[in-house]
Amino acid sequence: MAAAPQFSTDRFALKLGLFYAAYFFFGGVQLPFFPLWLEARGLDARTIGMVIAVPTLMRIVATPLITHAADRHRALKATLAIGSVVGLLGMTVVGLADGPVAILAAFTVAMVALSPMLSLSDAYALSGLGARGRSYGPVRLWGSVAFIAGNVGAGFILEAIAPGHLIWLIVFALIRSRPAI
C-alpha cells in the first residue's frame, strides 16, 4: 500500500500546492459547467460551440509563443502572475459581458492568458522543488484533488444556485490562484 502524501512545511511547496489546487479547481468547474452558464445566458448550441472553439484555436498559437518568451527572458514567475491577473480580469468581464460577441472576446482573452499556466507552473515547480530537494508529485497531487472537488462540488452547488451565477464560482477559483504564486 502506498504511503499517504506528507504535508509539507516548505513555504514554496505549500504555495505551489495552493496554486495547483486553485487552478485545477477552476478547471474542474469551468470545463464541464461553463457551457451551462453560456446556455443560461441565452446562447444557442452553435454559438456555445464557437465560444469554446475560438479560444482553443487561439491557444494553439499563443501558448508556445508565451512560454517561449517566458523561458527566453527567464520570467516564469512574472508570466504566471501576469497570466493569472489577465485571466481573472478576462473571466470577470465574461461574467459582466452582454451578448455573444462580448462573451467570446472576453473568454478568448481569458483563456489565452491562462493557457500557458500549466506548462509554466510545471517548469517553475520542477525548478524550485528540485533546488529544494522536494518531489513534484505530492505538490501536484493537490491539483488533481481540487479538479475532482470542483467537478463534484459545482454539481452540488448547481442544485442550490441558478446556472447563471456559476461564473462567479469560476472567478472565485481564479482569485484564489493569484495569491498562491
Q: PLM features: residue spans?
A:
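Transmembrane alpha-helical segments of major facilitator superfamily
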Residues: 51-59, 143, 173
